[in-house]
Design a protein with these regions (language model features):
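Bacterial N-terminal signal peptides that target proteins for export
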Residues: 1-7
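C-terminal motif of bacterial Sec signal peptides marking the signal peptidase cleavage site
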Residues: 14-16
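Structured, acidic catalytic/metal-binding patches in enzyme active sites
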Residues: 20-27, 32-245
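A cross-kingdom marker for long, charged
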Residues: 239-297
Length: 297
């Protein structure tokens, strides 16, 4: 079922809002991820497409990236404080728990129950806790197992890498959304879609590795068309899902960027690479408003 494949990548696409474990280190090749510049007479905005989680040792920084970041006086990310675990827990308590839910094992097909039980054991989350969670929340709670299997580390992701030294330098960080906003994207999904999401988390590790490798390879090469194809393959089968996770958010961000041009300064915007690729990308929406984004890497 196509929706199952979509669900398997949703947690990765929105990984900034999910609980994530550490993993072992490993050397990885570098790359040249895509970057754009939007500017007028007194304002420059850099747009950099990120990967929220990466393998340790992945070398993705370039001189052009470092120059753009160093010249900026404001950093904008999807979420301003990625380390706010208390805030994330509070948002999860508010949105992710409901009374009277069926047991978590009853929310997947019979042939997936054993795999789900094994993942629960690997995650170390009590089944009784997951039983009280809405299906999307339980899927996110288990997503850390997938990240670990893929060899990913939240501390190696683009945002975490640049956030700490930026804050240490006393420069401001702004979030386009909050953790609660991102959890809310999942909370509004129909139960059928939430269960497909859970099945996708439980599905074959080999499939997840193959899909993620394609995404990571396109990102590292700066292959924007490849990124767009990956996200199109995963989301076009569900227009409602794509609208919620991509299109409406991109429109809001494009509106914010256009208004930000009214104030002088240099801004570095780091958001998930999928938002900067495809027909409903942030850049396309800016272009529709007469604002041009020029690729600089």
């Amino acid at each position: 079922m196509k929706l199952r494949r979509i669900s398997g990548l949703l947690a990765i696409a929105l990984a900034a809002c999910a609980p994530q474990p550490g993993v072992e280190r490993g050397e990885r090749p570098g790359g040249h991820p895509a970057m754009w510049r939007v500017a007028d007479a007194d304002t420059t905005i850099y747009l950099f497409g990120t990967f929220h989680l990466l393998p340790q040792g992945r070398d993705w920084r370039t001189p052009a990236f470092d120059r753009a970041l160093a010249s900026s006086d404001e950093l904008v990310m999807e979420i301003a404080d990625l380390g706010d675990q208390a805030g994330a827990a509070q948002a999860m308590m508010k949105l992710g728990l409901s009374p009277g839910l069926p047991p978590i094992l009853d929310r997947v097909p019979a042939e997936k129950k054993a795999a789900l039980q094994a993942m629960i054991a690997e995650a170390g989350v009590p089944t009784a806790v997951l039983d009280r969670m809405e299906t999307w929340a339980a899927a996110l709670a288990l997503a850390g197992v997938t990240y670990r299997r893929l060899g990913l580390d939240p501390n190696a992701g683009v945002e975490r890498t640049i956030e700490a030294p930026w804050k240490a330098g006393g420069k401001p960080v702004r979030g386009l959304e909050t953790v609660e906003d991102q959890f809310g994207l999942f909370d509004t999904l129909p139960e059928e879609a939430q269960r497909s999401f859970l099945v996708g988390i439980v599905d074959s590790p080999a499939d997840a590795k193959k899909q993620f490798a394609a995404m990571l390879d396109a990102w590292a090469k700066g292959d924007v068309a490849g990124i767009a194809r990956t996200f199109d393959d995963e989301t076009l089968a569900s227009p409602e899902l794509r609208a919620a996770l991509m299109t409406r958010r991109n429109a809001k961000w494009a509106d914010w960027l256009k208004k930000r041009l009214d104030r002088p300064g240099t801004v570095f915007v780091a958001v998930g690479a999928g938002h900067l690729a495809g027909n409903d990308s942030v850049q396309r929406m800016l272009a529709a408003e007469g604002v041009k984004a020029v690729r600089v890497q």
